[in-house]
Design a protein with these regions (language model features):
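Short beta-strand segments enriched in hydrophobic/aromatic residues
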Residues: 66-69
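Structural detector for hydrophobic anchor residues on beta-strands
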Residues: 48-50, 62, 80
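Conserved small/polar residues in nucleotide/adenosyl-binding loops
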Residues: 128-131
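Short, solvent-exposed loop/turn segments at conserved positions within beta-propeller repeat blades
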Residues: 72-75
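Surface loop/turn signatures of beta-propeller and other carbohydrate-active proteins
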Residues: 2-54, 86-117
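Entry beta-strands of beta-propeller and related beta-repeat scaffolds
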Residues: 59-63, 121-124
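Beta-propeller blade signature
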Residues: 78-84
Length: 131
C-alpha cells in the first residue's frame, strides 16, 4: 500500500490530509467532518457532498452537486461552489437538468448526484430509472 498513485492532473490547491497513522485504507475520511453542515441552506435538514470537480470560474476553484434533504425529507439537488474545497457556497435554488431528451429534464428523485468533465463540458447525472 505504500505505492499509491493518484491518476489525473495535478491539483496543488486541493485540500489533503495524509493517511492517519497506522491506517492501511486506500481512502480515509477528513478528520474535521462534516465539511458541510446539515443546515447549510435555509430549508435543509441534511446535506450530502456527493460530487465535486475542479472548476475554475471567477474566484471559485471547485464546483459540486449536492443532495440537500429539506425539513420534509424531500431530496433535492443543489449546485455549490468553493474557493478551497472546504468552505462552500451552496445555491438555495434547486438544480435543473437539461438535455436533448425531454425525459432528462423531468424531475423524479434527487438521489446520489454525480458530475464529470468530459472534454470541455460538465455532465451531471443522478438516480435515473432504467427500463
Amino acid at each position: 500500500m505504500s505505492n499509491l498513485k493518484i491518476m489525473g492532473p495535478a491539483l496543488p490547491d486541493m485540500p489533503w490530509e495524509e493517511r492517519p497513522a497506522g491506517s492501511k485504507e486506500v481512502m480515509w475520511r477528513y478528520s474535521a467532518n462534516p465539511i458541510i453542515g446539515r443546515d447549510a441552506l435555509s430549508t435543509s435538514n441534511s446535506v450530502f457532498n456527493s460530487a465535486v470537480v475542479p472548476f475554475k470560474k471567477g474566484k471559485y476553484n471547485y464546483a459540486g452537486v449536492f443532495r440537500c434533504d429539506d425539513t420534509n425529507r424531500r431530496m433535492r439537488i443543489h449546485a455549490g461552489f468553493s474557493v478551497d474545497g472546504i468552505d462552500w457556497d451552496i445555491r438555495e435554488e434547486d438544480f435543473k437538468l437539461v438535455g436533448g431528451d425531454a425525459e432528462i429534464g423531468q424531475w423524479v428523485y434527487g438521489y446520489d448526484p454525480r458530475v464529470a468533465k468530459i472534454g470541455d463540458k460538465y455532465y451531471v447525472c443522478l438516480l435515473y430509472t432504467s427500463p
